[in-house]
A protein has these predicted regions:
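Active-/binding-site microenvironments in catalytic and ligand-binding cores
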Residues: 1-133
């Protein structure tokens, strides 16, 4: 299970190393340095250089709306560097009604044996919300 402060960032297109550094910096600034989860809303894909930045950023998890977090030219290397650095990957999120900012994430995967991935029930809590939809 993954629970903790999460930063949601909106981005469309390829995320290069420079953009990844900006995202990490914004996450730390917004969440007062207490963030180990970054979720990317939009049609974004992480390049190998960006994956290196995220891998060094002491993240627990990175998530995206696409079915793969990686750019088409670096699917295996992006997944490998993140996983080798202990960064879990959460793909296929529905963030279309989530504004950028700070949230609390709870992601509870199904316990399956001998698999490289598992479906999970993930939800965000916005402690600043004034009303519930």
């Amino acid at each position: 299970n993954v629970v903790g402060t999460a930063y949601v960032h909106y981005h469309n297109g390829r995320i290069n190393g420079e953009m990844a550094e900006k995202i990490v910096s914004l996450a730390r600034e917004t969440c007062k340095n207490d963030v180990h989860i970054i979720l990317i809303r939009g049609r974004a894909a992480v390049s190998f250089e960006a994956a290196q930045v995220f891998a060094r950023a002491d993240l627990t998890l990175i998530g995206c709306e696409f079915q793969s977090i990686a750019t088409a030219d670096a699917v295996v290397p992006v997944h490998r560097i993140l996983l080798d650095h202990g960064v879990l990957i959460l793909e296929g999120l529905r963030l279309d009604f989530v504004d950028p900012g700070e949230y609390f994430l709870c992601a509870a995967p199904l316990k399956l044996g001998n698999t490289e991935g598992a479906p999970c029930r993930a939800f965000l809590i916005d402690f600043e919300v004034k009303h519930w939809r």
